[in-house]
Amino acid sequence: MPRTADTGLEGRIVDAAYQLWSQGGERALTMRAVARTARTTTPTLYQRFRDKKDILELLRKRAQEIMFSYMRRAHSAEDFCLRYFEFALKHSNEYELIHADWVVRLAKEEPRPSFELLKKSLADRLGGAPEEHAGLALALAALLHGTATMLLTKRVPERISRELRHACVAAFETLVENAAGRSFRPNHHGAARR
C-alpha cells in the first residue's frame, strides 16, 4: 500500500522552526533540530525546503505578521512607540530576524507591513499620500530601532530603560509635530522615497 502524503507536515516544520527561533535565535535553528522538533527526518525537510534561508524567509514573514498585529492597535504616536518596544522586548529573537537585513529589503522594496502602517498613519495624521511621508517614516523607524536595540542590551538598569523610552517617545512626537508644520524631506533621493 503506498504511503499517503502528510498534508500538515510543512506547517509542522514551520511551526517547529518558529518555536526553535523564538526560544534560541539563529544558533538554535539547525535543519536537524527543525526536523527533530517537527517529528520528521532531515531528508524530508530538504525535500520541502532548499536550505535554512528558505525556512528563515517564512519565519521572517510570520514574525512580521505578529509585529504588525502589535502595531496596528496603536491609537497614538506614544502608543505606537510603546507597542514597538513591547514587541522587541517580548520577542527579541523575532525582532532580530525582522531587522537583520531590513535596510537591504527596503532597497529591494520588499514588504514591510509595520513600516507601511507607519506611513499610512502619518498620512492620516498629516494629510497626503503614505509615500509622501516615506522620509519621515524612515527617520522615525531609525529612531525606534536604535532605541529598541539599546533596550535589548543585557542588564539595562530600569531607570535608563524608562529614560530611553521617554526620550524616544518625545523625539518621535516632536518629529511628527514638526512635520505637521512643514514637509519633511530627507537630503537624498534613495530607497525611502520609492
Language-model segments: which ranges?
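Amphipathic alpha-helical packing segments from all-alpha helical-bundle domains
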Residues: 103-139, 162-177
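Helical hydrophobic small-molecule/effector-binding pocket
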Residues: 78-112, 141-144, 152
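Amphipathic C-terminal alpha-helical segment
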Residues: 97, 141-159, 174-185
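Generic hydrophobic, amphipathic alpha-helix propensity
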Residues: 9-17, 34, 59-67
